[in-house]
């Protein structure tokens, strides 16, 4: 089976639609940005992904579905630093430092998430900014944004 387009996301399904038999494809965060790949489901079925559109995969994307079954994307846990600034100054200070290092970050209402880096952990300790080191699933890929200093 070759998957060429995403058929939706389980977050947008009704409770009835979520009752289908679910097969999962577990991906590393770095694999979410790959348009072409061969993967194996948790039931041992091999499928090819060759997306026509240049989009990143996300947790819950539906790769295939019929009347009774669906295959969805799940994401393996990631080794993260979860940064919890107490105020705008701390948030600005650490965001500036991370930006200077060109580190991709993700944000929730109260947290900044970055892939684990011992140098950043040392910096957080030095600055006294609250953080935790966690194994956590993220819904989308960490992506570097290119730029130049011209």
UniProtKB/Swiss-Prot annotation:
GO biological process: protein folding; protein-containing complex assembly; urea metabolic process
GO CC entries: cytoplasm
GO function term, MF aspect, one: nickel cation binding
Subcellular location: Cytoplasm
Alphabetic keyword roster: Chaperone, Cytoplasm, Nickel, Nickel insertion
Superkingdom of the source species: Bacteria
Family the entry assigns: Belongs to the UreE family.
Function: Involved in urease metallocenter assembly. Binds nickel. Probably functions as a nickel donor during metallocenter assembly.
Protein name according to UniProt: Urease accessory protein UreE
Organism: Staphylococcus epidermidis (strain ATCC 35984 / DSM 28319 / BCRC 17069 / CCUG 31568 / BM 3577 / RP62A)
Lineage: Bacteria, Bacillati, Bacillota, Bacilli, Bacillales
């Amino acid at each position: 089976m070759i998957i060429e387009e995403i058929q939706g996301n389980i977050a947008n399904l009704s409770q009835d639609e979520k009752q289908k038999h679910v097969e999962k494809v577990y991906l590393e965060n770095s694999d979410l940005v790959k348009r072409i790949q061969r993967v194996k489901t948790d039931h041992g079925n091999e499928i090819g992904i060759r997306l026509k559109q240049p989009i990143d995969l996300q947790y819950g994307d539906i790769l295939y579905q019929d009347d009774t079954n669906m295959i969805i994307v799940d994401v393996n846990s990631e080794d993260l630093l979860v940064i919890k600034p107490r105020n705008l100054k701390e948030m600005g200070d650490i965001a500036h430092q991370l930006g200077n290092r060109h580190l991709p970050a993700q944000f929730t209402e109260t947290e900044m998430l970055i892939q684990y880096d011992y140098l950043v952990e040392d910096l957080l300790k030095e600055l006294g900014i609250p953080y935790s080191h966690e194994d956590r699933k993220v819904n989308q890929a960490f992506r570097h944004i290119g730029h130049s200093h011209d």
